[in-house]
Every structure is written in C-alpha cells, then in structure tokens.
Amino acid sequence: MLGSLLAVALAGAAVVGMTGWQIAAQKDATLVAPSQVAGLRLDESENGKSTADYLQTALSAEVDLDQAVGAAYLDAGGHNVLFFGGTALIWTPKNDLDSAFNLISDDQGAVTDLHDVPAGRLGGTMRCGKTATDDGDMTVCGWADHGSLALGMFPRRTEADSAELLRQIRAGAQTRG
C-alpha cells in the first residue's frame, strides 16, 4: 500500500515538474513582425497596415496578451498572408488557441476541421483548419505555447503549405528570453 502511494506521488511530482519546466522554458517569449520572413515581405500599404492593426486588436480583445503584433505579408506573386499574435504567460495554450480561432468566426461561419499539426522545433501546440470566404475556403493555422500565441490566415494556399509557412514565420518572429 505504501509502495503504491509512493509510486502515485512520484508520478504526480514528475507531471508537475515536467509542466513546470515547459512553462519556465516557454514563458519569456517575444514576438515581432519582421520586415521579411519565409520569402514574404511586409505589406506596408495603408490597407495592409489597417488589416494588421484590426486583427491585432481583435486578438487582444479575445485573448489576454501582454504584447501583441500584427502584419500583412505579400509573397513574390502578390498573394497575402495575415499574421497576428502576442505574448503572455499562457497557462492553457490549447484552450487559448481555440479561443483565438473563435475570433475568425463571422457571418460566413467559423474555422472548421480544426486538427493538430506538428508545431516544429519551438514546440507547443499547432492547429490548422479552414474558414469560408467569398473566394472559397481559406486555411487558418495557429500555434500556442506557454509564452506566445499567433494565428496566420493563408488565402489560396494548401493546408500543408500554410502549416509549413507558419512554422517558418514563427522561427523568424518568436524568440525566448
């Protein structure tokens, strides 16, 4: 009996220790919108800036963030990518990410078919889904860890391409202190 209690206590301590380690390793993140990242360049047009500001503000209203960032990017073909996110101590990354996906909901519907995809070397959780637009379905992907959360909207891109592009954007935009 005592051996069983000791085993349960040790298992519980291991879980708490592992979670504590993840929080400590991820909590001091910074997030920026680089002028160029992953083959994309910052869209500095008035429309690009206002769209990025709107999404940044909407995300900050949905998720409690200490610092937020938003950017509209263009690829060489003129196709855009919208990126917005922020940093804070995030206790429940997956739940907060799901809340952030809710902000994409509009009169045409919500983000559907959400599922996990590999988060890459920075870890945390990453999910992708799609949302309906006037031009057809658009891929939406996002990540969250204990220090940051971000979403990307990828018109005219496949889910696989969008997920890889978000991992590349994250590698250029996120650092940990």
Language-model features, listed with the residues they occupy:
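Hydrophobic single-pass membrane-targeting/anchoring helices
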Residues: M1-K27
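N-terminal hydrophobic targeting segments that direct proteins to the cell envelope
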Residues: M18-N47
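Short extracytoplasmic
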Residues: Q36-D66
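A short acidic-to-branched-hydrophobic micro-motif
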Residues: G70-N95
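Short Gly/Thr-rich strand-loop-strand
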Residues: D98-G136
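Sec-exported extracytoplasmic/periplasmic mature domains
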Residues: D106, R170-T175
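A short, surface-exposed interaction/processing loop segment used at functional sites
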Residues: G109, R156-T158, G177
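A short, solvent-exposed beta-edge/loop patch
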Residues: G124-R170
